[in-house]
Amino acid sequence: MGRSESQMDITDINTPKPKKKQRWTPLEISLSVLVLLLTVIAVTMIALYATYDDGICKSSDCIKSAARLIQNMDATAEPCTDFFKYACGGWLKRNVIPETSSRYSNFDILRDELEVILKDVLQEPKTEDIVAVQKAKTLYRSCVNETAIDSRGGQPLLKLLPDVYGWPVATQNWEQTYGTSWSAEKSIAQLNSNYGKKVLINFFVGTDDKNSMNHIIHIDQPRLGLPSRDYYECTGIYKEACTAYVDFMIAVAKLIRQEEGLPIDENQISVEMNKVMELEKEIANATTKSEDRNDPMLLYNKMTLAQIQNNFSLEINGKPFSWSNFTNEIMSTVNINIPNEEDVVVYAPEYLIKLKPILTKYFPRDFQNLFSWRFIMDLVSSLSRTYKDSRNAFRKALYGTTSESATWRRCANYVNGNMENAVGRLYVEAAFAGESKHVVEDLIAQIREVFIQTLDDLTWMDAETKKKAEEKALAIKERIGYPDDIVSNDNKLNNEYLELNYKEDEYFENIIQNLKFSQSKQLKKLREKVDKDEWITGAAIVNAFYSSGRNQIVFPAGILQPPFFSAQQSNSLNYGGIGMVIGHEITHGFDDNGRNFNKDGDLVDWWTQQSANNFKEQSQCMVYQYGNFSWDLAGGQHLNGINTLGENIADNGGIGQAYRAYQNYVKKNGEEKLLPGIDLNHKQLFFLNFAQVWCGTYRPEYAVNSIKTDVHSPGNFRIIGSLQNSVEFSEAFQCPKNSYMNPEKKCRVW
């Protein structure tokens, strides 16, 4: 039998025997040792590199922050010559103002992004939505329902006009229909009480400045159809706006007459609307300039209703104007009777005196044409496309925009403005990181402490006033993120909007409902105490606020995001961002307006005469500094150093306090790791992030508008003005003395 294959020998009998193993040569041994050593060194180096701390932060958040800062800046610019160009040059090259925008800035980009979130949360109904949220979503859907809006033309407005004495220019036989029953008191009161529209006389219920727990009636000068009284010069840079304004009136009057089936006499319409412009121009000239209305002590004139009748006896259409009838016509809508002994605060006595001779020159038809027009112009954008388009040239003249914002953007903002707590709930649930609240609370505590410590450095303020200032700073109440109730208390939120009932196909009626609801709510407050725990803003807002009557600072959820704040970004950026904003809002309690209110929010003079005089002297430095800035986009006009003083004081105080708070942080916690790819230390990064918040630009038309209407300086001057006054900035960037960013004369109030 042969052998099994499994047992075959594995070595062939013919395979030669192996040779005896040879030893390694000294060279081979040396090379092997060398390779081993190199391998060990390489592994060690890799291990060391992986754990080596080179002082550079390599986290994804640091990389993102560095990329954002680098992208926005122009490193080739000289920081000591023009820090705006240095900080924002890259941003300006990359960004073009959208056709729908009058200006564009980092602030506006954040607002655009917030609007996207609002759109997402408002457009999708959910079965679990509480009633208040359902109403917000219904209101939004009615607003974006352009098919329904366009199909109705101007009919919703035409149905409403008889409730406000009609619009004479667009009414056949107005004198016969309305003229006999018309009275100025009733006409002005109806627009005010039902729709919150204040024409000729601004009557409103608000907090009593001298007793901030109570509400009181106020009488003030009205807002105007054009942005400011300056526009009514109607020459030079204002000529186009005046022409577009009258053309806007004429176009709407023709549309209404056409829709009513009335004949159109273009010459007659033009004559009537030019008369409206003439009347409004006289009213504008009677108003007091904004720079003369900055002292709340001088604005506050308390008197009884009977005294108002004696002091400001007006006459319209040959009849004495009854202040009592006018007041009660408004307040009767909320079932409140106003006796002649009722106290009223008059903010504009000079206006009322100047108004008297104007009123005798015009007829009821002229007044009603103006009153109804001022109401109609607000409602045109709620009507069909034909009506909306009538506003195009006017919008271009005031804002420089050639296109409307997307419908969904306008609607998201409208719903947010009218149902801020319902929308705030949706925003918070979708986008707000709750842990931010505690970090910001700590920042507020730090910056408040710095403000109080800084009082010791002030040589212009005496000890008595410093003590009162410290008490006020300690009494400031903060509100961060959102009111807890909007998320946790469904019943309270539902009850807030209980009276509102919207229909998806009746957007115009929904708007009217909101106007009535809002005005009724405000008028009813006259006999109620002020709720100082109430938030003065919604959560879905990219902004921050100070209330002098409440001595309260508010930082809504919408602003607690980069570049202002992130729990993950470097602290230098947080202090330069939200830290500066916190300091800014605290300082508002001590600016040219806020300093007149005490720790309880009452208009009380708590300053010694010497300290008050010194404050005005210190402030005057900033009035001159900012008033000397010439803005090319506004035709070379100079900024108004008086109107912008409060904001400029707050900017300067805020940047100084935030920087000192950051220095304290570094002393306590040590230096932070540097950001990758950007050759700046954290002192420099603090100022860079502060500046980049204000990167932006304006359309020339809106620059002309805002230089007269905005109490803030334009972004570039907010950067330059405050940093020119900062010794710490010049030290951080080693700016030579008398360079543009480091002038010898520096202004400081706080």
Curated annotation (Swiss-Prot):
Disulfide bridges in this chain: C57-C62, C80-C735, C88-C695, C143-C411, C234-C242, C621-C747
Location, primary (coarse class): membrane
EC number: 3.4.24.11
Annotated control of activity: Inhibited by mixanpril, an orally-active drug used for the treatment of hypertension.
Topology of the protein relative to the lipid bilayer: Single-pass type II membrane protein
Superkingdom of this protein's organism: Eukaryota
Subcellular location as annotated: Cell membrane
InterPro entries, per the entry: MetalloPept_cat_dom_sf, Peptidase_M13, Peptidase_M13_C, Peptidase_M13_dom_2, Peptidase_M13_N
Entries under Pfam families matching the protein: Peptidase_M13 (PF01431), Peptidase_M13_N (PF05649)
Gene3D superfamilies assigned: Collagenase (Catalytic Domain) (3.40.390.10), Neutral endopeptidase , domain2 (1.10.1380.10)
Motif (Stop-transfer sequence): 16-23
Lipidation (N-myristoyl glycine): G2
GO cellular component, one term: neuron projection terminus
One BP annotation, GO: protein processing
Keyword Transcription regulation belongs to the record: no
Cofactor detail note: Binds 1 zinc ion per subunit.
Active site: E585, D651
Glycosylation sites: N145, N285, N311, N325, N628
Peptidase M13 domain ranges (all copies): 56-750
Keyword tags: Cell membrane, Disulfide bond, Glycoprotein, Hydrolase, Lipoprotein, Membrane, Metal-binding, Metalloprotease, Myristate, Phosphoprotein, Protease, Signal-anchor, Transmembrane, Transmembrane helix, Zinc
Residues in compartment: Cytoplasmic: 2-28
Family named by the database record: Belongs to the peptidase M13 family.
Protein name: Neprilysin
Annotated source species: Oryctolagus cuniculus
Gene: MME
